[in-house]
Curated annotation (Swiss-Prot):
GO biological process, one term: signal transduction
Taxonomy of the source species: Archaea, Methanobacteriati, Methanobacteriota, Stenosarchaea group, Halobacteria
The organism's place on the tree of life at top rank: Archaea
Occurrences of domain Methyl-accepting transducer (ranges): 495-731
Topological relation to the membrane, as annotated: Multi-pass membrane protein
Name of the protein this chain belongs to: Transducer protein Htr18
Cell compartments where the protein resides: Cell membrane
Function: Potentially involved in chemo- or phototactic signal transduction.
Amino acid sequence: MALGTYVPTAIRTSLLRKAAVVIVTIMLVLVGVGVFTTQAVSTQVTEQRDTELLTSTEQEAEALEEWIGRQRSATQYLSQDNAIQSAPQADKSEVLSTRISGLTETAAALHYVNLSTDTIRASTDAAVEGDTYTSYSIPWRGEGLSFYGGGDVITSSVFNYRGTPVMAFASKQPGSDNAVFVFHSVETRGEAFSRNIDGSYTQVVDIEGTVQIAADESAISSAYGAGRDAPVIATGLTTNSGIETRDGLLVGHAKVEGTDWVLLKHAPTSNAYALEGDVQRNIVVLIVTAVAGLGALVLVIGRDALTALTDMSDRAEAIAAGDIDTAIEETTRIDEVGDLRRSFRDIQEYLQTVAGQADALAEQDFDADALDKSVPGRLGESLETMHWDLETAIADLEDAQETAEQSRKEAEQSREEAEALAAALESQAQDIRETVEHAADGDLTQRLETDTDHESMAAIATALNSLLEELEGTIHRIQRFSKDVAESSDHITTSAEEVKRASGQVSESVQEMSADARQQNGIVQDVSDEMTDLSATIEEIASSSDEVAAKSNDAVSVGQSGRARSQDAIEEMNAVDEQAKRTIAEMEALDDEMTEIGEIVTLIDDIAEQTSMLALNASIEAARAGEAGEGFAVVADEIKSLSKETTEATQEIESLIADVQDSTTDAVTDMQEMGDRLSEGKSTVTDTVETIDTIVERIEEANGGVQTINTATDEQATTTEEVVTMVDEVGSISDDTTARAEDAAAAAEEQTASLTEVTNRIQDLSDQSTDLYELLSDFTVREDHAVADGGAENTTGAFVRSASTDHSRDATHHDT
């Protein structure tokens, strides 16, 4: 809300009243500022005077403290002066007079005193020589005149010395009973205090309330105020410094350090604050002068200006009411009022010219004299532009009417063409939508027509066809690959079963060998036991030798058969290992193919985003075309919907691919584990074969020994000792054979267990390959797709070329 709304109407309608209100307001502000300034100056002057007095008081107290210190030092120096000590008695007074001249002007007397007799032996005042100093009742401070060593200085309070108030400084000469007394005039010291304010004076008061130093002799030794109960004394001794006002006096107090004295500086408040009254009077005079000047300004200038402004206000109201011919008198005034009246006359002439030109333009009288006059400013430029525009518009109106019909016809033709274009785009968008829906349902055999008049739609169709071609080829390769994996897994399973059966046969053979070896060992032991009866049972030995020879031949045959079967098992394990390696490579290739499918789906997402941008561009074109672009708007909505559905379809495909990739990853992991187990089984079988070879060798050796025994049966009667030795050897070999046969049996059982685990892993791989093939069966592809042969041409970049190369490599591997 404007400030003027709070001003009464009677004031707002009169400039004189406004001026009066402003002047009164200014006067009130001046008075307020003056009062504030007076108070501020008064406070500032008061604080300044207080500060000056306090500073002076503190400085005087410090100076007095320094003066006392100097006098103590001087007294101590005099007590140690050899000239005074060594001077003859008759010359001591002269020496003292010489020394006192070097002291300050306050020094009133210098005495040389004998403390034993209390006698003044020499003095600068000859009248007191021979007197006792106790006759002056010197009020020594502290414990009296008691020296504790050379160099001590004792001071006194104020006392009267021959009519002069003084204070004494005393110091004892080292090694004697003599001392030096110096009397200082406190009146002279009081006259040294400054008097920077008229009527001011300074006094030094001790703790008892007695004036010790003052310029007024009558005040010295008198009680100050209420004596020791005076508040200013207590305050001065407890605080360092301060200012107080009492009895019309401004009193500054400061403690004299090292003493029990307070220095008090007094100044009459009327004199101390005299500057405050002068400043206040000057400010009042300034305010009165300013108010009087403002009043004179209103009377002299306001009345004349108000009359002229009232007249000009009436003329302005007439012009505002439309009376632009109202009389405005000329004036000879050269001030602002005269300039204002002349400006009003110029405005009147300006408005008259503008009105004449407006009338001529309204009547379309382009030859009127008023139009020849110049009208300055933007209004003149607008009138001139209006003149030429109106004249040109009238000339162009007929031409516009002729072209309007032609424009209408062209607009109708454009609308028909736009509708046809919208219909074509809508049809193509529907085809794209159906194709993408089929692809989302798994049918990858659908293709779009690329023969269209619209480059953008043709590019989209070409890109989508290329995408579907690559996706179909990839799915086809994965289907074939998963089928090959399943077939390879079945073949590996069959081979593993054969290996398992062979291993079982090997295990049985080894167990038979172990049983024969144990039986052979028992026979050999029996032979060894019966050797003591060999002479009586030679025929039984021969029979046993024949039986042992037969068993040994059987063991050799079984060992050779086991060796052959073990070699077959190794060859079969090698074949299984090679097949497992090929299967692992194929599963890893399948994992790479699934990664490529994921990248293709990403490409589909990019195309969907481009489709969204195409829909946005179509919407913009439709907005520009207005009603003729309604078809574009419909097509844009369809394309936008198609883009959204494509995105959803790619998300479903991504989910399906993720499941397939998980299955593929598990299959690859299982195959790798199976490969590790096959390697372990291969090592076990190799160890078993080596053990069997050793067993066969041992059996052949045992068989040779048995045949030797059988051949030498006829000679046993004569060579019993040789037979015993050979039987022992056969027994040792039989023990080794038995142990190795048992090891071979255990190894064969372990091999059988490993082959069982391998068979189970292969069966799991076959099941996972079957699941993968079933997942991929959701996609419909062409059996004769070119990509399956590794010869597909594509234009999607290095990624698709890499996929084709990998497929060709896989195809070559399978052909091999």
